[in-house]
Amino acid sequence: MDSKIDSKTFRVVMLPWLAYSHISRFLVFAKRLTNHNFHIYICSSQTNMQYLKNNLTSQYSKSIQLIELNLPSSSELPLQYHTTHGLPPHLTKTLSDDYQKSGPDFETILIKLNPHLVIYDFNQLWAPEVASTLHIPSIQLLSGCVALYALDAHLYTKPLDENLAKFPFPEIYPKNRDIPKGGSKYIERFVDCMRRSCEIILVRSTMELEGKYIDYLSKTLGKKVLPVGPLVQEASLLQDDHIWIMKWLDKKEESSVVFVCFGSEYILSDNEIEDIAYGLELSQVSFVWAIRAKTSALNGFIDRVGDKGLVIDKWVPQANILSHSSTGGFISHCGWSSTMESIRYGVPIIAMPMQFDQPYNARLMETVGAGIEVGRDGEGRLKREEIAAVVRKVVVEDSGESIREKAKELGEIMKKNMEAEVDGIVIENLVKLCEMNN
C-alpha cells in the first residue's frame, strides 16, 4: 500500500479488458470517482500503458496510478499483442485464453496494494475468485447494452422451456441472425461473472435509455443494478493534423454530413467497402469516412465524389466529429462505445452491425427511435440501394424528422448525465462495500 495515500481514502483496483474502448470507459469512471475520496489503481498490460499515460493529465497523477499486469509469456502471443489494438483477428482467442491465466500475478498485485474494493470487467471470472480468496469485495462494471445482459441472464437462469418464449422484450432480437439458446457455455460463464459481483452491478447506461432492461436484470439476478451514465470521452483539444477535418466540416451545412466509422478493431472486407461506397455515392450526402486502410475497392470512388466526401485512413477524433454542427448522421457498426457517443451528441445512427453484441445495440437504437438498421440480402450482404435510402432518410428527408428529434432528445438527457456527478446512490453503495473491508 502506498504510504502517501490518506488513510481516509478508499483504495480501488480497476481491471478493464485489454481493449482501448474498455480501458477508456474505466478511465472515465475512475476520474469521476476521484472526486469522492477514492484512490484508483488501473491494471492493464505493459502494452497498454502508453495509451493510459496519454489519457491521464497531471490533474490525476496523484489520484490514479497505473499498475502493470503480466500476462503469461508465449511465442504465439508476443508482448506487442497483449492488447486488442492492432491484434490480428486469428489471435483474439489466444489473447483471451492467456488473459485468463493472469490470476497469479493479479493476486500478487492485490496482496501488495491491499485495496478496499476491486472493479472488474465482463470476461474475468478469475478476478472475483482471486479477490474472494483475499476477502476483498469485488463488483462488475458492465460496459455494454443492458438489454443484452438481461437476455443473457434470462437464458441462463430460466428453465429451457421458458427461454425465448417468455423473455418479455423480444423487440431487441436482432434481424436475420440466430438468437443464443440457453445452455451456451459462453453465456453461462458471462452470467457467472455477473453473479460473482458483490451485492451490486454497475452498468454503463441510463434509466432513461434502458430503464426496463435494468430493472429486469436486477430482478433476474437478485442484485442492485446501478447505471453510471455513458462514460464517454468528451471532445478534446485537437492536434494540428486533425484541424483540417474540422475546417472541411465548417464549410458544410448544419446536420448535412454523415460520419462513417466501424471502430478500431473491425476490418471491413472489400465487398463491404464497395457496398458502403456505392451507397454513399448514390445517396449524394456529404460524408467523412474513417477507414483502417484504403484498398483497391475504393479505386475511382474518391475521385468521383470529389469534395463531397473525405476518406481518411488514420485515427480521427470521433467525439469532435460527432459533436460538430455539420454532422447529421453516423454510419456505425454499433459498438456500445460508438453508440453511446452518438447518443451523447444527439446524432442518429445508420446501423450496420457486424459482430458480437452489435446487432442487439442496433435493435435497441431502432426500438428507442434514434436509428435505422440497414437491411441485408439472403447471404448477409449489405443492400447497396438501402444504404443510400437509409442515409437520405436519416440525414435529409422529412420522413426522418422524428428520428433526428429523438436523437437530439436523448443527447440532451445524456449531456445532463455527463455533467452531473456520479449518482449519490452509486457512491453510497461503493463506500458501503469499501467499509466492509476497512
Swiss-Prot record:
Reaction equations catalysed: cyanidin 3-O-beta-D-glucoside + UDP-alpha-D-glucuronate = cyanidin 3-O-(2-O-beta-D-glucuronosyl)-beta-D-glucoside + UDP + H(+)
Keyword DNA repair listed: no
Effect of residue 152 to A: Loss of activity
One annotated Gene Ontology cellular component of this protein: cytoplasm
Cell location: Cytoplasm
CDD domains: GT1_Gtf-like
A Pfam family matched in the record: UDPGT
Coiled-coil regions listed: none
Gene Ontology BP terms: carbohydrate derivative biosynthetic process
Main location: cytoplasm
EC number: 2.4.1.254
Known regulation of activity: Inhibited by copper, mercury, UDP, UTP and partially by calcium, cadmium, iron and UMP. Not affected by cobalt, magnesium, manganese, zinc, nickel, tin, uridine, sadium malonate and glucose.
UniProt xrefs under InterPro entries: UDP_glucos_trans (IPR002213), UDP_glycos_trans_CS (IPR035595)
GO MF annotations in UniProt: cyanidin 3-O-glucoside 2-O-glucuronosyltransferase activity; UDP-glycosyltransferase activity
Residues binding UDP-alpha-D-glucuronate, per UniProt: 264, 315-316, 333-341, 355-358
Tissues in which the UniProt entry reports expression: Expressed in petals. Not detected in sepals, stems, leaves, tubular corollas and white petals.
Keywords linked to the UniProt accession: Cytoplasm, Glycosyltransferase, Transferase
Protein family per UniProt: Belongs to the UDP-glycosyltransferase family.
PANTHER family: GLYCOSYLTRANSFERASE
Subunit structure: Monomer.
Protein name, UniProt field: Cyanidin-3-O-glucoside 2-O-glucuronosyltransferase
Organism the protein comes from: Bellis perennis (English daisy)
Highest classification ranks of the organism: Eukaryota, Viridiplantae, Streptophyta, Embryophyta, Tracheophyta
Gene encoding the protein: UGAT
